[in-house]
Amino acid sequence: MKTFVICSGGLDSVSLAHKVAVEKTLAGLISFDYGQRHKKELDFARACAQRLDVRHMIIDIRAVGEGLAGSALTDEIDVPNGHYAEDTMRITVVPNRNAIMLAIAFGVAAAQNADAVATAVHGGDHFIYPDCRPGFIEAFQAMQAQALDGYAKIALYAPYVNLSKANIVSDGVRHRTPFEATWSCYKGGKHHCGRCGTCVERREAFDLAGVTDPTTYEDAAFWREAVARKAG
């Protein structure tokens, strides 16, 4: 199955790219520049494409991103520290981000005679991000079936949608994902901050999976405090 992977350069999407490269036919990686503060993630997506020897498209939607104001990922708003499950992390929502990216990726896949588009949304995202939930995935697939009716049949492949990030780490190990060559931090500094929601979730996932985390964090201990606070 000829499949394009939406790849941010993060742990989840890079692991998915390696999975697709082994289990299907990887047609290429599609990344998006939407004005995100952690734009350095795109360098990791580019490196992934080079490593897997496939085409990499970086699609510039910064003009769209300018209209999606109010998120800590795009505006000069402090990225909150803490676990993803905390309500404070809602400030990191970019409205309709996945729907916009998927719609573009489906268009590319149809034009390139591909069979599927893969996205790395996962169970850990459900609390904060509505466009990462199973209902959204099912509805988007149904919408695209109508949008491309008579032109192309493109499947939406979301193998992690009901899995945890720890499950993704385990899957990444099976498919030899080089975790050190992935970027998760929303703050986009020299190293992972270790304090934002995605850093905390990343560190916790390695711990739960029983896999050594190769990541350098500016604050390597904070995640335990954040996880304990979440637990109660």
Curated annotation (Swiss-Prot):
Pfam families: QueC (PF06508). It comes from Chelativorans sp. (strain BNC1). Signal peptide: none annotated. This is 7-cyano-7-deazaguanine synthase. Catalyzes the ATP-dependent conversion of 7-carboxy-7-deazaguanine (CDG) to 7-cyano-7-deazaguanine (preQ(0)). Belongs to the QueC family. Pathway: Purine metabolism; 7-cyano-7-deazaguanine biosynthesis. Keywords: ATP-binding, Ligase, Metal-binding, Nucleotide-binding, Queuosine biosynthesis, Zinc.
